[in-house]
Amino acid sequence: MESSTSTSNGTGARGAVKAGPTRRRSDRTAGTLVLIGGACEPTGEALGAFLRQCKALDGGRIVGITTASQDPAGSARDWLKSFAEAGATHVEIPIVDRRDQAQDRRIAKMIEGADGIFFGGGDQVHLVATVGGSRVDRAVREAYANGATICGTSAGAAALTETILAGGEPDEYGQMQDLHLGPGFGLLGFRAMIDTHFTQRRRLQRLFMVIAQNPETLGLGIDEDTALVVQGHLGEVVGRGSVTFVDGRGVRFDNADECMDGKPLTLSYLRVGIVGSGYTLNLRERELEVLVQARQEEAAGVSELEVLRSEGMEG
């Protein structure tokens, strides 16, 4: 097993790494997902959300997976520097760039004992093809079930959904070809699909196209250096940008099947929302949590109603 590691004294080493025992967490029954739209700053709020969740600044162990990168070892070295800059000292990144490495029991054991597991960016299709269904994949799921925090940035975030999106970058007219849809790791449910670098790479049209073709899917477009922190069915937005959500269940007309031949997209009654930093998206209801709560309070008759009246007017 080839690996790249950092330790508490900041030095690196190559070779087999001995993993600690698996830690079962009794404070919660499932972990947290931190989904970052790419290009996260080492000391920014998006990556900071992951470090806080897995208590990395207080000795929590992080295991990184850089399989999505064209150069997993180079990416591992870069991430070790970024995590060190952020203040995380217990970070291990085993090099997994082939299927046989994803079946390595030593790497799986390392992952099972981690407080946080980090998926770097690159090619989400390659990541899922290499790791999906392997011992590493099963170890990630086991750790998540026991309360570990799973973080992905860019392709690493896109791969955590049930269905992944790749390719099909729009041209200046919003037209595209060669869209790829395939199975992901499925840790994020709710029939959600993630697109990253969303505002920065003008991917709104691409997400519209995919949702038009798959109207039951919930599209999530995450900006760079921005995270959607998901616990249960609630996702809080943290960082510099926003998260766009797209719900196609109410669409009345679209010509999505014609668009792959170069025709412009025509679409009506698509539901779109933008969630800024500090606000929470209810993934189950596909709505801002503040509005879900308001509806529930109104239905229960407990919502407050403030009315100012002119003097002498009876209430």
Predicted regions and their residues:
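Catalytic-core regions built around general acid/base machinery
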Residues: 53, 109-113, 133-147
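Catalytic nucleophile loop
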Residues: 118-121, 140-164
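General beta-strand structural signal in soluble alpha/beta enzymes
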Residues: 35, 92-94, 118-119, 150-153, ...
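Portal/gating segments that form or line small-molecule/metal binding sites
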Residues: 69-113, 119, 126
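C-terminal and late-domain segments of enzyme folds
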Residues: 2-58, 70-85, 166, 170-315
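Short internal beta-strands
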Residues: 61-67
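Glycine/threonine-rich flexible loop motifs
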Residues: 124-134
